[in-house]
Amino acid sequence: QSRVGKTPEELASELNSRPFYHGTGTDNLVAEDVNPYMTQPDSLFGMGFYTTDSPKIAKGYAKSRARGGGTPTIFRTDFNLKRVLDAEIPAPSEVREAITKSMTGWEPMVQARQMISKTIDDPSATTEQIWKAIRNAVGEISVSDEIPKHEFLDHFYEMALNIQRAGYDAITHTGGKRTGSSPHTVVIL
């Protein structure tokens, strides 16, 4: 279904109306233990609980996550979302402000903010483009200044919290475009 022109509330309603799936390498995951901030920061949109509307894609993730001896498991989830941020449309001003607020205080993050200023200040830039620019800037700073990437985690965590505080409880984008697989809807909590 097309997301073009939908409000964050309309998008949430549409996504709430169908099941989503999460593929993992563990069979003992329970909803109460899911903490999006204890996940991999190197994922496309950083830390979060990634789901897809494609059971086939979730199965692939489950198999890859279980390679180290785990149990490939697919969990179905149903949402009760209120407002969803579409990462493929121009980032709303409150999202830009939430991200910018997280890039202050610590000199390497201030430097990263300067590096991405052209992108984040461009009103046509999508959340996806801004996030990619941040990841690239942090990667460059990490190498040039010999700062381990995990040193930036608190700031990425703060970005996610600030986006939540701006009123969004999930992010969505079209999966498969980067990997050449079939298009599918991804929702990140």
What spans do the regions from the language model cover?
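Active-site and NAD+-binding cores of ADP-ribose-processing enzymes
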Residues: Q1-P55, K59-L189
